[in-house]
Swiss-Prot record:
This is Large ribosomal subunit protein eL18. InterPro entries: Ribosomal_eL18, Ribosomal_eL18/eL18-A/B/_CS, Ribosomal_eL18_arc, Ribosomal_uL15/eL18, Ribosomal_uL15/eL18_sf, Ribosomal_uL15_CS. It comes from Haloarcula marismortui (strain ATCC 43049 / DSM 3752 / JCM 8966 / VKM B-1809). It comes from the Archaea. Belongs to the eukaryotic ribosomal protein eL18 family. GO terms for molecular function: rRNA binding; structural constituent of ribosome. PROSITE patterns: RIBOSOMAL_L18E. Stabilizes the tertiary rRNA structure within the 23S rRNA domain (domain II) to which it binds.
Amino acid sequence: MSKTNPRLSSLIADLKSAARSSGGAVWGDVAERLEKPRRTHAEVNLGRIERYAQEDETVVVPGKVLGSGVLQKDVTVAAVDFSGTAETKIDQVGEAVSLEQAIENNPEGSHVRVIR
């Protein structure tokens, strides 16, 4: 079944294009995960990002970031969607960006960690 969300469809196309053109295999992996049913998309709390992310790293969440937990590391978090509290907490110590912006800033996909 095709995706009915036009933003998600164009995001998947952009991810695949970035993976083909710049060789960033991480973007192809994220595109494959987003093509699966929505119930399998990641829902990641800030505590998990704090546990697994390194300083000055880009964390990609193929789904939604939720606001439970504390984030103290200076990381850039890229996701399809953020809860209101998650975006506020991330912006206090790091940067919350959309996946579209992450592809623009880093088309090769270097120093990226996918968390789900």
